[in-house]
């Protein structure tokens, strides 16, 4: 289970330390890909395999299914942690997420999001205004 938010430096080689609490959950490998909100998504390999199977089951005749495949698979990188518990963020993904020297790693239970520090702050700031409407909206789902 991945929970919490952690700010880390991205070094000149694009290396980002993954929080120590998260590393055991990534021992079987991981996949890094583009997210939906100009962020990056980091999946443990077992979770990625399940997600990929569901995406691959979508009909290729639907434009939205093709676009989802492009978003999730075209920029994806199969990675591993180095001895210091870091991953290398590929340049194309750093550019997509506008990550320069600071990144925020957030636990999303079964996967991890990686944000530029600036973009994450914008997301947090929006919560103050949107929280009541969000609470009302998700109540329809029984949450």
Curated annotation (Swiss-Prot):
One of its GO terms (biological process) is negative regulation of DNA-templated transcription initiation. It comes from the Bacteria. The keyword Transferase does not apply. It is found in: Cytoplasm, Nucleoid. SUPFAM superfamilies: AbrB/MazE/MraZ-like. PROSITE patterns: SPOVT_ABRB (PS51740). Residues 5-47, 76-119 form the SpoVT-AbrB domain. Coiled coil: none annotated. It holds the Pfam family MraZ. Keywords: Cytoplasm, DNA-binding, Repeat, Transcription, Transcription regulation. InterPro entries: MraZ (IPR003444), MraZ_C (IPR035644), MraZ_dom (IPR020603), MraZ_N (IPR035642), MraZ_sf (IPR038619), SpoVT-AbrB_dom (IPR007159), SpoVT-AbrB_sf (IPR037914). CDD domains: MraZ_C, MraZ_N. One of its GO terms (cellular component) is cytoplasm. One of its GO terms (molecular function) is transcription cis-regulatory region binding. The keyword Acetylation does not apply. PANTHER family: TRANSCRIPTIONAL REGULATOR MRAZ. Forms oligomers. Belongs to the MraZ family. This is Transcriptional regulator MraZ. The gene is mraZ.
């Amino acid at each position: 289970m991945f929970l919490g938010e952690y700010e880390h430096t991205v070094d000149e080689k694009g290396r980002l330390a993954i929080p120590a609490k998260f590393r055991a959950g990534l021992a079987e490998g991981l996949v890094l890909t583009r997210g939906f909100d100009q962020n990056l998504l980091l999946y443990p390999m077992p979770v990625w395999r399940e997600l990929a199977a569901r995406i691959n089951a979508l009909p290729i005749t639907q434009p939205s299914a093709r676009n989802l495949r492009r978003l999730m698979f075209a920029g994806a990188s199969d990675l591993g942690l180095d001895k210091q518990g870091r991953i290398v963020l590929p340049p194309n993904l750093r550019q997509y997420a506008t990550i320069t020297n600071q990144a925020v790693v957030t636990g999303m239970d079964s996967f991890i999001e990686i944000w530029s520090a600036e973009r994450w702050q914008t997301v947090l700031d929006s919560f103050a205004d949107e929280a009541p409407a969000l609470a009302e909206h998700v109540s329809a789902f029984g949450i």
